[in-house]
Amino acid sequence: MDGVLLLNKPKGMTSHDCVAKVRRLLGIKKVGHTGTLDPNVSGVLPICLGKATRIAEFLTGATKTYEGEVTLGAATSTEDADGDIIAVQTVDRTIARAEIEAVFRSLTGDIEQTPPMYSAVKVNGKKLYEYARAGIEVERPTRRVTIYELELLDEREQFVGETVSFRFRVMCSKGTYVRTLAVTIGERLGYPAHMSDLIRTASGPFQLADCVTLEEVERRAADGTVDALLIPIEQALFHLPKYEISDKVAEKVKNGALLRLPAFLQELDGPVLLVTPEREAMALYVKHPARPGVMKPLKVFR
C-alpha cells in the first residue's frame, strides 16, 4: 500500500496520534505525516504510506493555507485558546475594517517571527515546550517566513465589544506560526490577542475538500477499498520534472544505477522523478556532483 492519504485531522488529536491511528487501521508500519498540526488545529494533513514515506520531505515545504480567528482583548501563554490568560485589556474603541486591512497589508510579504515558547522548535537540543512546561523562558532565534496573502473574511465594517473576534485567511510559507501572526495582528491594533480558531484548508495542491476523516478511513479499511483514497507518488510530486524511462532502464534504477543526463534536463536544479511508461514512480535522481552529463539516485522506491 503506497501513496499519500489526505486526512482531515480532527481537533484534539496530535499529528502523531493520527499517524498511529492510521497505522493501526491499515495494519502497515511505514506511515508518516508531512507537517505537524497542533492538537487544537484541524484540517489538511497529508499522510504518506509505504514507499511514499520516502517523499515526505518533498511535501513538507509546500505553501500552506489556513482560515482562522483572531480574538482581541486577551493574550494567552500558548498564543491560542488552549493556554492560560496572561493579559487582558478591554477593547475600548471601535475598530474600523480599513484599520484591520491596513495591518494585514503591513504583514504581507517577508516577515520575522519569534517562535512561541509552546512549540517544537529546538534550542540547545531541547524543544521549547519542554522549557515552557518547566517554567523556563529561553532566548529564541527569529525566523524569516513569507505571508503570500492575508485576507479579512469578516464582512463587518466596524468591530465593537469588550473583546473583538474576526476571521481571516492566510496563505503562507512553511514554518509560519499562525498563532504568532494573530498575536502580532493584535499588537498592531493596540491590544493583547490570541488565535481562537484555526483550520488548515490547503497544503500545496491538496485541498480540504479532497480530505477524508478517520472514520472514512476505518470504513474503507473494513471493506478493502482504502487504495482508492490514495494519491500515487507520481501525482503527489506534481511539482517536480518528470523523466519517462523504459522498463529495461527501470530495472537498472532499482539497483541504483547511474544514468546519462538527458539534454532537456541539463539545466536541472534539484531532483527529477523517473517514471515508467505506466506512470509508476521509480526514483528521484539528481545531477552527479562530480561527473558532468550524469545523474545519480537520490531516492529509489524499491
UniProtKB/Swiss-Prot annotation:
SUPFAM superfamilies: Pseudouridine synthase (SSF55120). GO terms for biological process: mRNA pseudouridine synthesis; tRNA pseudouridine synthesis. Keywords: Isomerase, tRNA processing. It comes from the Bacteria. InterPro entries: PsdUridine_synth_cat_dom_sf (IPR020103), PsdUridine_synth_N (IPR002501), tRNA_psdUridine_synth_TruB (IPR014780), TruB_C (IPR032819). It catalyses: uridine(55) in tRNA = pseudouridine(55) in tRNA. GO terms for molecular function: RNA binding; tRNA pseudouridine(55) synthase activity. Its EC number is 5.4.99.25. It is an enzyme of class 5 (isomerase). The active site is at D38. It holds the Pfam family TruB_N. PANTHER family: PSEUDOURIDYLATE SYNTHASE TRUB1 (PTHR13767:SF2), TRNA-PSEUDOURIDINE SYNTHASE (PTHR13767). Responsible for synthesis of pseudouridine from uracil-55 in the psi GC loop of transfer RNAs. HAMAP family: TruB_bact. Belongs to the pseudouridine synthase TruB family. Type 1 subfamily. This is tRNA pseudouridine synthase B. It comes from Geobacillus thermodenitrificans (strain NG80-2).
